[in-house]
């Protein structure tokens, strides 16, 4: 009955969309329109240059740095819900894919395990789609190492809005509620000057920590702050050998935290990660978000970048995925996909525009690649064209290489081989392809071919919708885009 009601709602919504004029009548791949509603968007994003098809004769190997960042999806969700224009570079397909949880398991002794699947490409039936999913080993919270956290919090005047400091306070109180008694917490704020509000309190002092966070108020400029230096000093002061030592930087995008040039800030953070102190970034608010800088700094600090647009998202980051958010299991994680040149004619990596590595970088154990948190699944999709299809022939070989974060062992690797095409792709493959297809439509990709919003919706409905709140929310987001953007 529940599924019947959902389908009925879909039919009604699609009927409304179908009755609209122009290119929206088919629910097809129309480019994003620009709604009049919403504030001016001064957000900044990394430039994402769409990748072209590459012949396997020229190069049959693609190397990618993996990580668990997924902030682009949260930001995209807020843009659509607020009826704001959608910049092309705001549509980061790999972060959209990596936002969701998947049912892959890792029962091996390795920290990372890969899954390969090849099936027909939904938006171009002349091609095929390869899914490379890398699953990190799960850890229970009680198995986690002790934590030493420094909260570096932006309380400048621009943080006054409800979706900035007030939401940040609620989010970090969620994190505090989940601390273990032997964890250590310090708090540094920055505005006109930096202030140390808490110096190495224990996780057992939750009431004290929460009270300090609750009392934060926004005001002043950010000139002259040395907040980032203070944060790392405290992290080093309370450093836990064998523990998880991390700075959490939360801001609406103002990075005047003591080092005026982003290059200097990146260098400083990179040097500090060598001491075992990592950095995670949390973006709040809209209109001033520097997603490009936050992505760059997170990578430099062996951490991830999250965008928190709601209390629900804060709960996802700090409760549902807490173990993965706090516990890195694989450092410098990278994947190499090698195609059989006798079978695969050409290929195109979808997303990961700024995460590709050379063969030399993949082989070099000193290459700075991504970090994967416990239980996380990182997904790469590659569209491929086949020459000939030979039964049970090797199509692709995948090598995952990383350093074990628990024992820092170098060059651990796992190899997976894919033989043949599946006629009945898994529900995970179907959902991943739906997310990617929506991304291609939003980007108005020249490779979207026959991508269709209607097909995206159908695939989601058939993909165990009732079992996952976040996938249900994604469906609602696609429908809202169809109704509020396409109909215009």
Language-model features and meaning:
Residues 1-6:
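Positively charged n-region of N-terminal signal peptides that target proteins for export
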Residues 20-38:
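Short, low-complexity, disordered segments immediately C-terminal to signal peptides
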Residues 20, 31, 112-332, 387-390, ...:
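Exposed acidic/Ser/Thr-rich ligand/metal-binding surfaces
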């Amino acid at each position: 009955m529940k599924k019947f009601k959902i389908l009925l709602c879909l039919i009604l919504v699609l009927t409304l969309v179908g009755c609209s004029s122009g290119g929206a009548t088919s629910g097809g791949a129309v480019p994003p329109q620009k709604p009049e509603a919403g504030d001016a968007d001064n957000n900044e994003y990394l430039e994402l240059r769409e990748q072209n098809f590459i012949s396997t004769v020229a190069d049959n190997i693609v190397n990618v740095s993996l990580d668990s960042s997924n902030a682009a999806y949260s930001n995209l969700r807020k843009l659509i819900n607020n009826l704001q224009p959608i910049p092309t570079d705001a549509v980061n397909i790999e972060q959209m894919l990596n936002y969701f949880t998947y049912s892959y398991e890792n029962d091996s002794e390795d920290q990372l395990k890969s899954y390969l699947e090849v099936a027909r490409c939904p938006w171009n039936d002349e091609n095929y789609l390869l899914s490379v999913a890398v699953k990190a080993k799960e850890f229970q919270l009680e198995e986690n190492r002790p934590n030493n956290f420094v909260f570096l919090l932006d309380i400048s005047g621009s943080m006054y809005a409800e979706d900035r400091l007030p939401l940040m306070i609620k989010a970090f109180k969620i994190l505090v509620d989940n601390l273990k008694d032997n964890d250590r917490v310090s708090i540094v704020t920055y505005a006109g000057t930096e202030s140390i509000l808490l110096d190495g309190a224990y996780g057992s002092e939750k009431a004290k920590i929460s009270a300090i966070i609750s009392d934060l108020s926004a005001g002043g400029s950010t000139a002259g702050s040395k907040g980032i230096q203070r944060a790392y000093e405290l992290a080093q002061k309370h450093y836990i050998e064998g523990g998880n030592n991390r700075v959490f930087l939360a801001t609406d995008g103002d990075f005047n935290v003591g080092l005026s040039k982003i290059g200097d800030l990146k260098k400083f953070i990179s040097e500090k990660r060598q001491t075992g102190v990592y950095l995670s970034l949390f973006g709040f608010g809209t209109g001033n978000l520097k997603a490009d800088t936050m992505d760059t700094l997170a990578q430099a600090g062996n951490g991830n970048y999250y965008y928190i647009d709601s209390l629900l998202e804060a709960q996802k980051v700090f409760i549902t995925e807490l173990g993965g958010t706090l516990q890195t299991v694989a450092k410098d994680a990278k994947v190499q996909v090698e195609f059989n040149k006798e079978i695969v004619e050409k290929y195109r990596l979808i997303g990961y525009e700024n995460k590709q590595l050379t063969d030399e970088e993949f082989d070099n154990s000193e290459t700075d690649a991504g970090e994967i948190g416990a239980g996380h699944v990182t997904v790469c999709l590659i569209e491929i064209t086949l020459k000939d299809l030979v039964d049970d022939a090797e199509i692709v070989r995948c090598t995952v290489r990383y350093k074990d974060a628990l024992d820092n062992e170098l060059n651990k690797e796992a190899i997976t081989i894919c033989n043949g095409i599946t006629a009945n792709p898994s529900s995970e493959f179907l959902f991943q392809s739906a997310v990617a297809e929506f991304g291609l439509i939003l980007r108005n990709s020249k490779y979207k071919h026959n991508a269709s919003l209607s097909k995206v919706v159908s695939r989601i409905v058939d993909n165990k919708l009732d079992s996952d709140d976040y996938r249900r929310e994604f469906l609602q987001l696609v429908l809202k885009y169809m109704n509020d953007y396409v109909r215009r």
